[in-house]
């Protein structure tokens, strides 16, 4: 394995430890990492934001840069956001979906328009409490079956489509 290939593997490994500040999930499992390039001790990471106006973008960038700069052999770490293609639920890994569900956050399989399921009891007998949850990427619901409130991840592309 070349030094560049070894560093690339280390970079991917360290990215798996960087968590989103608003969600209990690594940015790799959330599907934020679009590309990683390594050359001569320089690392360049391109991220896809879940929401364009997400207030956590600067925090995520700082966390990624800090983690990368701590790696031996990294002289320079550049992190930028790309808006070439929108983030979608398809980018999230099964492990990421499971972590969010374990945290009590429902995640639609593919579209926000799917019926919501309570992460506590699995019931679909739920009601939307507010489309505007504690962060721009979550909505709040209440389960009629177990009476637990819960949050549901909402993909931005689906919300925009539902308003047309």
Model-derived features with residue positions:
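Domain-level signature for proteins that mediate thiol-based redox and metal-cofactor handling
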Residues: 1-164
């Amino acid at each position: 394995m070349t030094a560049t290939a070894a560093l690339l593997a280390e970079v991917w490994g360290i990215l798996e430890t960087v968590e989103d500040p608003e969600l209990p999930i690594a940015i790799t499992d959330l599907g934020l990492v679009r590309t990683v390039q390594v050359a001569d001790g320089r690392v360049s990471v391109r991220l896809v934001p879940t929401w364009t106006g997400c207030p956590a973008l600067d925090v995520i960038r700082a966390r990624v840069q800090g983690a990368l700069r701590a790696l031996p052999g990294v002289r320079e770490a550049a992190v930028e956001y790309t808006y070439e293609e929108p983030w979608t639920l398809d980018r999230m890994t099964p492990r990421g979906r499971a972590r969010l569900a374990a945290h009590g956050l429902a995640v639609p399989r593919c579209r926000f328009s799917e019926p919501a399921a309570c992460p506590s009891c699995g019931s679909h007998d739920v009601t939307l409490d507010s489309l505007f949850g504690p962060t721009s990427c979550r909505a709040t619901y209440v389960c009629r079956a177990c009476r637990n409130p819960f949050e549901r991840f909402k993909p931005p592309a689906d919300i925009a489509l539902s308003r047309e």
